[in-house]
Regions:
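N-terminal, post-signal-peptide region of Sec/Tat-exported proteins
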Residues: 46-78
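Short cysteine/histidine-rich zinc-coordinating motifs and their immediately flanking basic loops
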Residues: 85-93, 186-192
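Extended amphipathic alpha-helical interaction segments
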Residues: 137-144, 148-189
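An amphipathic alpha-helical core segment
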Residues: 175-205, 209
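The canonical Cys-X-X-Cys-His
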Residues: 71-82, 131, 159, 169-181, ...
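Post-cleavage N-terminal segment of exported redox proteins
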Residues: 2-5, 10-11, 16-57, 93-157, ...
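Substrate-binding/catalytic groove segments of enzymes
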Residues: 170-171, 183-189, 222-229, 248-250
Length: 258
């Protein structure tokens, strides 16, 4: 093959790659879910004394310092809070030992099992939500910055496919609402861009704190689609894709949502 032809093919490959990673919402138009709330709920989220999610953060801080498992270790035995400042903004990520994609909940449970010889915490349990909220609170204000390179690439692609896949009796995808219709009204609500940067979050409809996967399941229920069990690989892949499309938005945990 001539040099000019090879260069043309290479340029085309780069162009296709760039197009594949193109965001439906340009970075300068990214808006956190809090931007679609009324002034009262934005003020509630910003007030650390009134924000109901802070109750879970406070409980998580106690659990962080509390010994657990047969080794009698606490999370704080190994990790200093100052070193946790950036952690939540970088998850989901590939675990260097198992080479598996982990979200923050998985990371907590893996540390408990491998380092503390403690039982893993059940998904959506108050204990796991509290620890996750406490850790994510340390990253509040830090921009999301996940990696989709190397072994994370396949999970990113799977998450993107999942995001654009039509589902359920209503035959809708995540993109139909959160890419194409954001800012428009749906009954009494304004459709957000569907970013994960506030989770775990306190939702008024739940009257409690819930995880991002709980929110995903609620969306699936809303379009009458099958809900997978907590911790399913498809949810983890989708979490990575959602974090990538929210790159640059600051962590807001604990968020407040309707």
């Amino acid at each position: 093959m001539r040099r000019g032809g090879a260069a043309l093919l290479l340029a085309a490959a780069f162009a296709l790659g760039a197009q594949a990673q193109e965001r439906a919402i340009p970075p300068d138009q990214l808006k956190s879910g809090s931007a679609f709330l009324g002034e009262d709920l934005r003020a509630l989220q910003a007030d650390e004394f009134a924000n109901p999610g802070m109750l879970w953060v406070e409980r998580g801080e106690k659990l962080w310092r509390e010994p657990a498992g047969k080794k009698g270790l606490a999370c704080a035995s190994c990790h200093k809070e100052v070193n946790m400042r950036w952690v939540a903004a970088r998850y989901p990520r590939i675990d260097s030992r198992s080479r598996k994609l982990l979200d923050l909940e998985d990371r907590i449970n893996r540390c408990r099992a491998e380092r503390m010889n403690a039982e893993p915490l059940r998904y959506e349990s108050d204990e796991l939500l509290a620890l996750t909220a406490f850790l994510a609170r340390q990253s509040r204000g830090v921009p999301i910055a996940v990696s989709i390179e190397g072994p994370a690439r396949a999970h990113f692609e799977a998450g993107r496919t999942s995001y654009h896949q039509r589902r359920g009796q209503m035959n809708l995808s995540c993109a139909h609402c959160h890419d194409a219709q954001w800012g428009k009204r749906l009954l009494s609500e304004t459709i957000s861009q569907g970013h994960p940067n506030a989770y775990p979050a306190y939702r008024l409809e739940w009257q409690t704190v819930g995880s991002l996967q709980r929110r995903m399941r609620a969306c699936l229920s809303g379009i009458r689609a099958e809900m997978l069990p907590y911790g399913a690989q498809e949810y983890l892949d989708l979490e990575l894709y959602l974090a990538w499309r929210a790159q640059g938005l600051p962590i807001e945990t604990p968020g407040v949502r309707r």
